[in-house]
Amino acid sequence: EKNVYKNYAGNGGFLVESLIRKALLAARFKTLKILFSQDINSESRVLMYRNITERVLKVVPFLRLDGDPYLVVTEGKMKWIYDAYTVSDRFPYSQTIPRFGNYVRNSVKIVIDAYEGSMDFFIADPNDPIILTWKNVFPELFKELGEMPEDLKKHIRYPSDLFTIQAFIYATYHMKTPQVFYNKEDQWEIPEIDNKMMEPYYMIMKLPGNTTEEYILMLPFTPRGKSNLSAWMVAQSDGENYGHLRAYTFPKQKLIYGPNQIVARINQDAEVSRQISLWDQRGSKVIQGTMLVIPIEESLIYVRPLYLRADAGKIPELKRVIVGYEDTIAMERTLEEALAKIFGQDALQSVARSNDKKKDPPIKTLSSSSNMLLKQSDYRTIKNMFERVMKRQEEMNQKLSHHKEDLKALGKALDSAVVVE
């Protein structure tokens, strides 16, 4: 393998141009290498503030940024989309949220070119008086959302931080009866898994009553002080439905297991417990991945990957997939095998056959060995979510591996360093 060198051809940054600017850069970065380097000439470009968060805040420090920027591909280019908020702590008669105050609006969509670093600021909420004031201060900085290219608009999604705030508020204010509200008789909570509050996650699914699948952001609720599930809430992101919030409640007389109850059932399952104990005895470390909560009809399917990392290994390896549905727990090598164990092999084969057909499949497929139902759209939802989690886990593992290598290199450098006093 050989190293491949390529010259930067973008318009990002600024030209070095002169010896004076070169000297100023050397002083700015406190190194003489810039001044005496033959590789840096008048046509060289200096790219500063390449971290997108730092870059954005240099321009709009008065905006609060979402914690989850996302990268999209549009018109052959890679661009970051950052959701930004206008916030205040002086809105009267409004509940305060830590870090955001008591007034929050997703007023701006920021688009950053990943190659050149150019930024565009689109006003997403023209009714927000704060962002309109800032627009009057900087009239050339902000653009109307209608000026955003149509292909880029298709990639816009509902921001996760705003949705978390709305879910937190709705957990209390969904109660409409004054007496019930005053006594907090039907208070909800965002569930916790492994002592950490669940974060909302994106998925593609067909909402109840809809005929097509769509991209949504979802979060479940549990009753206050209890572990069973009471409802789930979604934010829609597609087209004209963008920004619409929906809440679906489960019948109170029906027990729907919550995340912690499923975790307890997984840990109590004889097969799962035996396999984990066997791996632990061999000196390997068992890592339980992100728990996925996927609505299916009037119930839920839980999916959790199981990783195994050897003592000498760097990256965990996916070993098993655990699926929970109602009273059944299944652990298999693949998601398909675990679903087949719960719903029956015939149901999965029917779904697989319908995936190969161009026309719409039957609405439901019934397993001959089980009375449980699995829709093709439900199967695609589960499969898509699982693949997204696997991809994200792989990216995190690669980053962790690079960090470990950098730390080892730093340790070797420190060990070989000569300290002069």
What does each model-identified segment do?
Residues 1-420:
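Soluble extracytoplasmic regions of secretory-pathway and membrane proteins
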